[in-house]
Regions:
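Active-site and substrate-binding clefts of carbohydrate-active enzymes
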Residues: 11-220, 230
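Catalytic and substrate-binding regions of extracellular carbohydrate-active enzymes
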Residues: 163-167, 175-374
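Zinc-dependent metallopeptidase catalytic helix centered on the HExxH motif
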Residues: 1-5
Length: 374
């Protein structure tokens, strides 16, 4: 927070209130987490305490960090020498635990900061090396799913829990959550290694999940399939599945499910809405040879998408030229939409870390499309 580019953080000692409503005693030091042990730093640390009227004590760290070697003999000797210089604030080498124990005595008097501790800098790290963010989040979900399936298989007496393999895969994921890998601010070679790690992670998770699904659903009916809900809440949402040859629809409890039969380059598949599948459970559906119930369908052409609610028109570059609301009989698009743009990205410093406030002022619309497909 000391590197905010617009607003100075207002407190040193405070209670941070999270979105859950819980309070945590916090301290924002005005000096960096690494540096020298000298007179200037001692005064900077002392004078930076904005709550000195509540607790007249400050906290600072010294040494070479971020891959350095910590404190040096010279720093420790200087710390002893500063104790004998008149006018220099009294210092003592201690620990963060002892510091927080001391200021905790006055914590009820601290101001409360309610909400996100937003860092006004390094906004580019939300998008840099996007494949890392994508694989990280997918890996977190898949690891949880693998743990659920492994636990279920063990509880049902079908196989042992794969603790060792899950630990190995978790460690691959966690290594790549290091604070420079995940934001996208590492050097190029790091991301070559990260791609290899994620490939190994994805292979391992796919193998483990498929093994557990095969164990749990070993007595499968070739005319049936099970939709599994890994969430801890009931799930309602779209399900897409390939249709075996000769089948046209899906049924549950001997009732036809409204669905849409679609096709792509890989063959025919069915799309339907699975409603209220219980948490951490599943529901088995059956393929049916009956024709699927008629559903209001989307009309899709080269320059048109239309259903019973909206009519959306596109030009030959893929830009939206019209959105017509059929229910209210009115046009709702004021100007051309879906314009694809690239923007000039020349941050003042740390190019992988930052986006400047004014980047939106330099758009370059991509007006000519080689091909457009709806």
């Amino acid at each position: 927070l000391c590197a905010n580019d617009t607003n100075a953080f207002p407190h040193s000692m405070f209670k941070w209130r999270s979105h859950s409503g819980d309070d945590v005693t916090a301290y924002f030091t005005r000096v960096s987490y690494q540096g020298e042990y000298d007179v200037g730093r001692v005064f900077e640390c002392r004078n930076g305490n904005k709550q000195s009227s509540i607790a007249d004590i400050s906290f600072g760290m010294f040494g070479y960090g971020d891959g350095g070697s910590g404190s040096t003999t010279d720093m420790l000797e200087r710390a002893e020498a500063l104790k004998n210089i008149p006018g220099v604030p009294e210092t003592v080498n201690s620990s963060a635990h002892e510091f927080f124990d001391e200021i905790g005595k006055k914590a009820d008097e601290f101001p409360v900061y309610d909400g996100e501790l937003y860092f006004e800098n390094h906004r580019g790290t939300f998008t840099s090396q996007a494949f890392v963010k994508k694989n990280n989040r997918r890996g977190e979900f898949a690891l949880r799913n693998a743990e659920i399936l492994s636990s279920a298989a063990e509880l049902m007496g079908k196989c042992d829990y794969d603790g060792a393999e899950l630990e190995r895969l978790w460690k691959i994921l966690l290594v790549n959550q290091f604070h420079d890998i995940l934001p996208g601010s590492s050097i190029h070679e790091v991301y070559e290694n990260a791609r290899e790690d994620y490939a190994e992670l994805n292979r391992g998770l796919e193998k483990l999940i498929n093994e557990k699904l095969n164990v749990l659903f070993s007595e499968r009916d070739p005319e049936a399939f099970t939709v599994v809900n890994y969430l801890n809440v009931p799930y309602t949402g779209e399900v897409k599945i390939k249709l075996p040859e000769g089948y046209n629809s899906v049924e549950y409890a001997d009732e036809q499910i409204p669905c849409a039969k679609l096709s792509d380059k890989t063959g025919d598949y069915i799309s339907f809405v699975a409603e209220k599948i219980p948490s951490l459970s599943g529901r088995t559906y059956r393929f049916s040879k009956s024709e699927h119930p008629t559903q209001p369908c989307v009309k899709a052409e080269k320059n048109l998408l239309e259903n019973n609610i909206l009519r959306v028109e596109f030009d030959n570059n893929g830009e939206i030229t019209s959105v017509f609301d059929k229910k209210n009989d009115r046009e709702v698009l004021a100007a051309v939409g879906n314009t694809l743009c690239i923007y000039q990205d020349k941050p003042i410093h740390e190019s992988a870390w930052n986006l400047e406030f004014d980047y939106r002022m330099t758009p370059y619309p991509l007006k000519t499309a080689e091909s457009v497909e709806v």
